Design a protein with these regions (language model features):
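Catalytic cores of DNA base-excision repair glycosylases
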Residues: 5, 11-15, 19-144
Length: 144
């Protein structure tokens, strides 16, 4: 399923496309707190799990509350799973809160309390699929 080099646009075309996308983003990007400089990988991770099938407008206040209450994976891992479900609020699909709690425990147990930077390690966490792993790697660690 590879792409042959002949099928790719010329490098000048790619550079123009890249520039156009960045220009568009600079004008139209929404100011999301989890995209702000200084947001921890944990903050990015939590936002990506919360945003699965949930409108951003609902995610933002809950995300802020979670970051205040559980600023690290170890903080969430130490809480009762029921606390995570209750704090999930109106986000829907409350099993995601349980998966997030399980992921926090896995990070604490297997990754020294840190969000792993490798896509393969992210995929091994509960509740993390291809999109979430790629988004966390990109936005938290700058992996293209």
């Amino acid at each position: 399923m590879g792409t042959s080099p002949r099928a790719l646009p010329a490098s000048g075309t790619l550079a123009r496309l890249h520039s156009a996308i960045l220009s568009w983003y600079a004008v139209t990007a929404r100011p999301l707190p989890w995209r702000a400089p200084g947001t921890t990988p944990w903050g990015v991770f939590v936002s990506e799990v919360m945003a699965q099938q949930t409108p951003v407008a609902r995610v933002e206040p809950t995300w802020r509350e979670w970051m205040q209450r559980w600023p690290t994976p170890a903080d969430l891992a130490a809480a009762a799973p029921g606390d995570a479900v209750r704090a999930w609020g109106r986000l829907g699909y409350p099993r995601r809160a349980l998966r997030l709690h399980e992921a926090a425990r896995a990070m604490t147990d297997r990754h020294g309390g840190q969000v792993p930077a490798e896509v393969e390690q992210l995929l091994a966490l509960p509740g993390v699929g291809d999109y979430t792993a790629a988004a966390v790697a990109c936005f938290a660690f700058g992996v293209p």
